[in-house]
UniProtKB/Swiss-Prot annotation:
Keywords: Amino-acid biosynthesis, Histidine biosynthesis, Hydrolase. The gene is hisK. PANTHER family: HISTIDINOL PHOSPHATASE-RELATED (PTHR21039), HISTIDINOL-PHOSPHATASE (PTHR21039:SF0). It comes from Bacillus subtilis (strain 168). This is Histidinol-phosphatase. GO terms for molecular function: histidinol-phosphatase activity. It catalyses: L-histidinol phosphate + H2O = L-histidinol + phosphate. Its EC number is 3.1.3.15. Belongs to the PHP hydrolase family. HisK subfamily. The keyword ATP-binding does not apply.
């Protein structure tokens, strides 16, 4: 099995570090990785307003061509040493499918490997970023009516992302399937049979659509998350279905490339 980190951010991330692309590549080589994918947060749909206070959830549209160009140069520089893939972490946002598809139709030809994630959930009056901070998550619980309702909306959104028609360049990998648990130590919740059923529907849809799962270790670095962003029972179900699992550090600084790769080897 190729040693690969399939979820890495870059200096183009407005809420990340200024570590250079080369620093990420060098860290990967130092840790014995053979392949990496840069998956910066794709620009959000033009008509969508980023609900975070600093509006820093994603790369600016104006930076996208330079991002692709710089990775292309790095690929040549590291040819024969490290396989580097150009990718994006694309947000699935309900009701913005047409804009997402247009974006993918435009930039998909330049991408090698991408992730489809859910960060934003719709409330009655707006969208909220579920992983921004604990205060926003508390607001989300209030807006949805209960913590179970937040989980239900999250997994319904994940399911919608999997079955959505987003064109031929739709990302093939589902990102951090339990990101909704980022603040679980502050807002404890054990999944009900209903929610577990929704997760199973998502896994069935991933299998049916020939998609992959992000084995995301960034939750181990989060104060309130409590672990890797996939529960053991989900992992077992995914393996039974032969869903490909791709290790992802979700590094936002070079030092986190390959973080807890041993957990991936042990469990996958």
């Amino acid at each position: 099995m190729q040693k690969r980190d399939g979820h890495i951010h870059t200096p183009f991330c407005p809420h990340g570090s200024n570590d250079t692309l080369r620093q990420y590549a060098e860290e990967a080589l130092k840790k014995g990785f053979e392949s990496i994918t840069f998956t910066e947060h794709a620009p959000l749909p033009p008509s969508f307003t980023d609900p975070t206070p600093l509006k820093d959830s994603a790369m600016a549209q104006a930076s996208l061509e330079r991002y692709i160009h710089e990775i292309s140069g790095l690929k040549k520089e590291y040819r024969g040493q490290l396989s580097i893939r150009t990718g994006l972490e694309v947000d699935y946002i309900a009701e913005f499918e047409d804009e997402i598809t247009l974006f993918l139709d435009t930039y998909g030809p330049y991408l090698d490997d991408s992730i489809l994630s859910v960060h934003f959930l719709r409330t009655d009056s707006s969208y909220l970023c579920l992983d921004y901070d604990e205060h926003t998550f508390k607001e989300l619980i209030s807006a949805c009516g209960s913590i179970e309702a937040v989980y239900e909306q999250y997994y319904r959104s994940i399911y919608s992302s999997i079955v959505a028609s987003l064109g031929v360049y739709k990302p093939k990998r589902v990102g951090h399937i339990t990101l909704v648990q980022k603040f679980i130590k502050l807002f404890p919740y054990s999944m009900s049979e209903h929610i577990r059923g929704l997760v199973s529907l998502c896994l069935n849809a991933i299998e049916e659509n020939g998609m992959e799962l992000d084995f995301n270790t960034s939750g181990l670095r989060k104060t309130y998350a409590g672990g890797i962003y996939i529960e053991d029972w989900m992992l077992n179900e995914a393996k039974q279905k032969k869903i490909p699992l791709v290790f992802g550090s979700d590094a936002h600084q070079a030092g986190d490339v390959g973080y807890a790769y041993e957990a991936f080897l042990e469990r996958c």
